[in-house]
Amino acid sequence: MSTSHVALPTKAERHKLFGSVPPIKGTKPTEKEQMVDLQNTPKNFLFALDSVGISNVKHPVNVETPEGVQSTVATFELTTSLVQDRKGINMSRLTEQLDAYHQQGWTVSNRSLIEFAQELAERMEQTEGQLTIRYPWFFTRKAPATGLSGLMNADVMHRVTYNLETGVANVTVGLVINVTTLCPCSKEISEYSAHNQRGYITIEAGLDETSMDGFDWRAALLDAAESNASAPLHPVLKRPDEKRATEIAYENPRFVEDMVRLIAADLYEMKQVVNFFVECRNEESIHQHDAIASITFDKRQDA
């Protein structure tokens, strides 16, 4: 077999061949102290802004859960308000703060996130610090008949704001979990069986800061979703388990409207929850489209 030989130019020559050019001799300052700071130049910029910052920031975190501390990967959105006489914020300070907390080995909890939001506002010299964090939460689930266990996961959310002027923190937590839903209409009109599908439950709950400590909100929201569904999902099912899971769903038919109302009732009874949003979306097994229903409720206004 013959081997051809290619005489390659040097790497620097190859870069030049494909368009690289040498740096020019610059005239602008290279020292930070001598550079123009556009963001902090005071001027009337017409409007104050509710929020400005960065999103889709992936970062490893330790999360405080009733089962113990879990290590996971979270997605952050870090923002602050912006006063009218400033062009922008110093966005590098946002990831600086996140890295500083990571280096200190912090554990994510509602309290530590309030502290984080407060420090954001102080560091950025703005009225309000805001953050949203999302991550997968893992928990153990046993099969309904055999008791065999496996890991399940739900998508968890914290949304926290802290206002420096009022000293008030707002904490909203959320959870997205999948369930089984069985159609009541299909069960009612059919001689046998009924169509069922996977439902996606989204819950967001505003917490009362004075009573949220010690509240196992993940378990509470998970139970509100699953206990009102036709049936929960399971990672491990043997034949006796599958039989029981199917029967449980048949015994508890639910429309999306039913799901939302039943979950809302559970949330209404939780004294730690001051407002909530619930959505149910079913991937209909006999249609191309999804079925959806939602409710937004504030106990302080709507009661």
Swiss-Prot record:
MF terms (GO), sorted A to Z: GTP cyclohydrolase I activity
Protein EC: 3.5.4.16
Reactions listed under catalytic activity: GTP + H2O = 7,8-dihydroneopterin 3'-triphosphate + formate + H(+)
Chain positions of site May be catalytically important: 183
Pathway: Cofactor biosynthesis; 7,8-dihydroneopterin triphosphate biosynthesis; 7,8-dihydroneopterin triphosphate from GTP: step 1/1
Cysteines paired by S-S bonds: none
4Fe-4S in keyword set: no
Keywords: Hydrolase
A GO BP entry: tetrahydrofolate biosynthetic process
Pfam families: GCHY-1
Keyword DNA repair: no
Family of this protein: Belongs to the GTP cyclohydrolase IV family.
Function: Converts GTP to 7,8-dihydroneopterin triphosphate.
Protein name: GTP cyclohydrolase FolE2
Source organism of this protein record: Exiguobacterium sp. (strain ATCC BAA-1283 / AT1b)
Species classification: Bacteria, Bacillati, Bacillota, Bacilli, Bacillales
